[in-house]
Every structure is written in structure tokens, then in C-alpha cells.
UniProtKB/Swiss-Prot annotation:
GO biological process annotation, one example: platelet aggregation
Tissue specificity note: Detected in splenic T-cells and B-cells, total spleen, skeletal muscle, heart, lung, kidney, thymus, brain and liver (at protein level). Highly expressed in brain. Detected in heart, spleen, lung, liver, kidney and testis.
Domain UBA: residue ranges: 23-65
Gene: Ubash3b
Active site, renumbered: R379, H380, H565
Name the UniProt record assigns to this protein: Ubiquitin-associated and SH3 domain-containing protein B
Organism of provenance: Mus musculus
Residues where Phosphothreonine is found: T12
Function (record text): Interferes with CBL-mediated down-regulation and degradation of receptor-type tyrosine kinases. Promotes accumulation of activated target receptors, such as T-cell receptors and EGFR, on the cell surface. Exhibits tyrosine phosphatase activity toward several substrates including EGFR, FAK, SYK, and ZAP70. Down-regulates proteins that are dually modified by both protein tyrosine phosphorylation and ubiquitination.
Amino acid sequence: MAAREELYSKVTPRRDRLQRPGTVKHGSALDVLLSMGFPRARAQKALASTGGRSVQAACDWLFSHVGDPFLDDPLPREYVLYLRPTGPLAQKLSDFWQQSKQICGKNKAHNIFPHITLCQFFMCEDSKVDALGEALQTTVSRWKCKFSAPLPLELYTSSNFIGLFVKEDSAEVLKKFAADFAAEAASKTEVHVEPHKKQLHVTLAYHFQASHLPTLEKLAQNIDVKLGCDWVATIFSRDIRFANHETLQVIYPYSPQNDDELELVPGDFIFMSPMEQTSTSEGWIYGTSLTTGCSGLLPENYITKADECSTWIFHGSYSILNTVSSSSLAFGDGALERRQYEDQGLGETTPLTIICQPMQPLRVNSQPGPQKRCLFVCRHGERMDVVFGKYWLSQCFDAKGRYIRTNLNMPHSLPQRSGGFRDYEKDAPITVFGCMQARLVGEALLESNTVIDHVYCSPSLRCVQTAHNILKGLQQDNHLKIRVEPGLFEWTKWVAGSTLPAWIPPSELAAANLSVDTTYRPHIPVSKLAISESYDTYINRSFQVTKEIISECKSKGNNILIVAHASSLEACTCQLQGLSPQNSKDFVQMVRKIPYLGFCSCEELGETGIWQLTDPPILPLTHGPTGGFNWRETLLQE
């Protein structure tokens, strides 16, 4: 609040400004902001952070960043010079971007719009951004008639890269243009710009699965590089503090429940550093808002991954080929260029969309002859402690330990625990919606004619309940029994305190009408689990118990379902595929992206003992959250 008062205190009252002679009415955006009483450094930072779009945009930025602890930090932004295509070729590249993502999934090239890199990222002080634009304008005017039209491009493919390379003669001209810009920028702004020294190209795809190469190559061959195209030299900037962060976009609103939480507004972007996630709770991440500059904890299911360039700021551009006067494309006032880019759909952030590809259901028993064995691994459903908070027990248990349902998403009843209701603190059940999620998955398996022969699950109650409801959806709850396997429990390092949860024994689970096999002898009993085990121990335990489960079921049915934790989808399948486990930091980041009822399918390759991930026989399950609602607090007037 102090920061807010300080910002407002520096704005001269309106009546005083109107009476003061010499008030700037038609000056530059900076002059107008200064006349409004904003400090010069803040005004320059606001203009740089909004691309000099307008005084209004700069004012909005300043007021939204009142609580930004780095508002007065002199750290400059990072800038880059790209060539971007416009016209028919740009549309063709846009089509390739969309088709390749839809058919083969996202690869690294999708993080940034189609472009040719002319220089490395460089820093420029906020006060010198206008001069940087002048440097680009001067350079373009000198080189305007020296470029080939159309720019000659050649398709190149390798095992993990596809691109359009600029032919050597034209590439040399572009490199000299970039070097001239670097010299002009150094002269006008004293910044150091390093021209791109590698072969100039438009990246179409890289870091993709080898199996996708033929499809991507065929799509790339459909791009007619001789189509009409104007290329524009464009400057973008980004906040240097978040250069190595993951970019996320908010899809649902969230109002903070605690002081360390971040308010979420749909459409805002969040920067997340993997290094800052080591101490966060399951289901939460720590991030920084683009709109406010504030940092805090936020629920991970309220956001989705966004392209790296989604938060970049467009500063202006000039055509290097056509004869339009540069004055019509004024630097720092990029409305025309911005509209052109939005019309092309390049680099913009699209609204949340679910694209369902035609999927052939896995009909396991529809073909005669030997069948391939399949392993399905599924995460549990929505859990009570995540939805209702760490102290959820106080909301639904009275002083005598009696369960009282206080929300429609709470189950009608809970199993009795021999150790008392406090055992639920470390072993929470799933919600009503969690049960519904699980039944939906079971019904989808039934509709796809997928037969499940064996079901194993972690001893966590949320996993047992999820497995039971999947069987209900499959209409197999009276025929199949769940084998509770402690070896499938998640990484014990994530368990709070010095003891493991006091899980409900199989006999008591069965007494609570859950379809549990009370005769099953686990491969890894509870006594063999160690608290705070190492990452290697957890990965090896998961792999070992999965191998033993597969061996146990051989010749007794082809399909095994494991219901466990988000980490299980990776830990139980990685080494089955002959792959080495990833490091613990990457593992943790991957696990955060697996939602409730996340489902994967692994198929054995003949009798080789090697398995591979395949398309699941069911569609994915996506849903949005619903925040708490109290009609008295919201509707009742004082």
C-alpha cells in the first residue's frame, strides 16, 4: 500500500495541472507522462515495457505495477532484431505452424513465430529505445534497394531439424546489413549488438520425435518458397529477468486465500523458474505475473503452457523490400504492423482450445491371434486436501471426530480409520468430482472396448478410490479386485514429517465396500519403504515393482492398469522403454504437468521385453476449477 501511495503522490492533481502555464498538450509520449508527474525513469520504463504504444498504455502499465518490487530497478530490457515475412509466404508458414502442431504436437520451433535471426539479444537502456529505432530506420534506408526480391530460400532437413536457409549470396548481404545496424546502434545508443554469425534461416521444426520426421518433411515440402513476400526488419524486447523462465498463461481466475498467493486474471502470463519450485506444495507453483510484476504461489491447474514469444514486446519495423516510405511505419508506434501480425495469426497467443484428433479405439480382443500386452498408468482423481486446503479436516470433522459434509464436493461419508480421523491428514480421500472423473475414464475404456485384466494401485486412499470408480465405470467393480501395492507409492521425499502415512489396511478397505483383493501379497511391503528416500531409490523401486507386476501377470491376461500418482506415469514407464531416467529437477517439472486422471499407455514390442508409449485408447480429460462461494459474503449487503 505504501508503494501505491508513493506512486499516486507523484501525480500532480488535475486542477493544479490545468492552471499551470506551459503544460504539454501535444508533445511526445514521454513529455506527456512527465507533465502528469511521473518520474522520468518510471515513465521511460513504462514506455519501453509497452513498446511506446500510447500514453494510456504506459499509464496502465505504471498503475498495474504499483506493487512491483522491481519497478524502480534500472535493469534494462533485452532486444533482438528479426526479419519477419509478410504476405502469401507468411500465410503459408502460418499454415505449416498450425498443421505441424496439430498433427505432430508442439516442438521447439513453435515457441517463436517464423523469422530470420539477424543478431543476438542485446541490452538497451530504457532512455535510448527511441534512438535504437532511429538506428534501424537509418540502416534500412541505406540498404533498401540492395536485397534480392524474392529472398531466395532452400529447404533443408536432418534427423532433428527442418528449416528454410537463405542462399549464400543473399545471406551475405543480410549479414552486412545486420553489421551496419550494429554499428549504427552503437553510434546512436552505445549498445553492443552482435550480428548473427551462423547460416541465416527460418526454423520450421526442431527437437521433435524421430517418428514425426516424414510427416513434418512432407508438410515443409508443401511450402512454396517463391510465393510473394515482403520481409520486415523488426525489433522485439523481453524482460531479461525471465529469459530462462517457463512462460505460462492464466486460463481461470483465482482470488488469493493467503498472503503468499498470487491473484490470477485470465489472459495474464506467469513466469516460472524451475529453481524456485523446490519448496512448493503439490499442485502449486511459484511464479511472477507479467501484468503486475508481483510474485507468489498459484494453483498449477489454473494455467497452461504458453509460447516463449507470447510476452515479447513489439517495438516497430521497417520493410527491407517494398517502396513504402518508412514514415508510414513509424518506430515505437506499431499499430499498423501489430494489426498485420495479428491478422496473420503469427506469434499471438490463441485462446484455450481443445483439438480432438480422430482416434482409433484400442480394441484389444477384436482381432484373432496373439495380442500385444498393454500397461496403462493413471494418476488418481481430485483430492480433498488440494481442493479444500491444508486444514480441510477442520471444515468437516467436529470436536468428537464425527464427519460432517459441508460442501457438495465432499463425499457423503468416509471410511472409518482404526487410527482415528487425523490419519486423513496424510492420506486424503478424493472428492465427489474425483469419483466422477474416475468413472468417466472407466466409461471411456468401456466404450473403446478396452479390456482390463489386472488392476494395481498405490496404498494411498485417493488411488484406491480412483481405481474402484474406474472399475465402476467399466462395470467391472463386482468382477475385478484391486491389488494394493505399497511399492507403487510416490517418492517418499514428498511426504511431510518423519513418518509415512498410516494407510487403511486392505481388509478395512474391503469392509468399506471398495473392490480390494484382501489375499494379495505385495511385492514391496510397507515395511520396506523408507522415509525421505533418494531419487534413485524411488525410480529404481518403481521400475522394479512394475517389472514384477508385468511378470506376475504374464499369460494371465494382456492388459494391466496401474492407478497411482502423477510421478508414476514417468517412473513406471521410462526404463521399460529402455530409456535412462531424467535428472530429479527435470522429473519434478514434468510431474507438475500431469493432471488428475492423467493417463498413459505403454505397449510391449513383441517378445523383446522393450515397451513403447502409444496413444491411449481414450480421449484426455480436461476440466476447469470452481472456486469457493459464500452467498453471505458475496451477495448480502451491509
